[in-house]
């Protein structure tokens, strides 16, 4: 990937990366992103679920939504994903920070127009969300597919940024505690379930995701 003025990280550039392998790792760990776009000079940021493969990130929504009009017009958008890893508590409040990994993707949306393309997206997305779910749920019918718009953005313009490690101390006061509080996302047991018996693919998903660090 060629780094340009848009993708280049300027603040703490030593934390930046343009390695696609790291981008895909962050995307694989996440479920939601924030999409920034502009309508007649007014900026908006919308949280959305996503699916990705090695080449594209996919977004979907109601055909009635304002953001879908922007997508369909082919206007440029940016997509951000944040993975928090810990709270960094320094001796001086001004030096407090967070450990994180983040990615920002730039591009123009392309619409998936046929039912076959949409159905393929839905099938891949649901098994990416919870592996094994596709075989344990009903795929959308003709009317349901008409009620969703699907777009993709190529993963060829992006930047990744990561902070890790301990505090960057300026103050040396020995009586003040400093350190990092690690932060992890954990999945709990299902609620509002249609049955008291939890399917094996759901159990495996919870166990696998909770084993990630």
Language-model segments: what does each one mean?
Residues 1-4, 117-213:
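C-terminal edge-of-domain segments
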Residues 1-3, 12-16, 20, 24-25, ...:
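Anion-coordinating catalytic cores for phosphoryl-, nucleotidyl-, and glycosidic chemistry
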Residues 3-58:
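An N-terminal domain-cap segment
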Residues 31-33, 46, 53-55, 73-77, ...:
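A generic structural signal for short beta-strands and their flanking turns/coil linkers
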Residues 34-38, 91-93, 109-114, 134-141:
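Short helix-to-loop capping/linker segments positioned immediately adjacent to catalytic or ligand/cofactor-binding
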Residues 36, 51, 60, 80-82, ...:
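Residues in well-ordered beta-strands of folded domains
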Residues 42, 50-58, 63-65, 76, ...:
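Short, charged/polar surface micro-motifs in flexible loops or helix N-caps
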Residues 64-124:
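Short, structured beta-strand-loop surface elements
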């Amino acid at each position: 990937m060629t780094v340009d003025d848009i993708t280049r990280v300027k603040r703490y550039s030593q934390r930046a990366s343009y390695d696609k392998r790291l981008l895909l790792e962050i995307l694989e760990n996440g479920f939601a992103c924030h999409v920034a776009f502009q309508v007649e000079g007014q900026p908006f940021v919308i949280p959305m679920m996503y699916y990705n493969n090695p080449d594209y990130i996919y977004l979907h929504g109601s055909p009635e939504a304002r953001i879908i009009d922007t997508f369909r017009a082919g206007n440029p958008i940016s997509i951000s994903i944040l993975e928090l890893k810990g709270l960094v508590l320094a001796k001086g409040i001004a030096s407090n920070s967070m450990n994180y990994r983040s990615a920002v993707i730039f591009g123009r949306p392309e619409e998936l127009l046929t039912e076959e393309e949409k159905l393929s997206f839905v099938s891949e997305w649901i098994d990416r969300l919870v592996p094994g779910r596709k075989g344990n749920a009903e795929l959308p019918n003709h009317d349901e597919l008409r009620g969703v718009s699907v777009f993709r953005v190529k993963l060829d313009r992006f930047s990744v940024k990561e902070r890790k490690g301990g505090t960057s101390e300026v103050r040396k006061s020995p009586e003040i505690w400093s350190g990092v509080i690690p932060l992890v996302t954990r999945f709990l047991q299902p609620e509002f379930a249609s049955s008291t018996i939890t399917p094996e693919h759901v159990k495996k998903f919870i166990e696998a995701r909770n084993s990630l660090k």
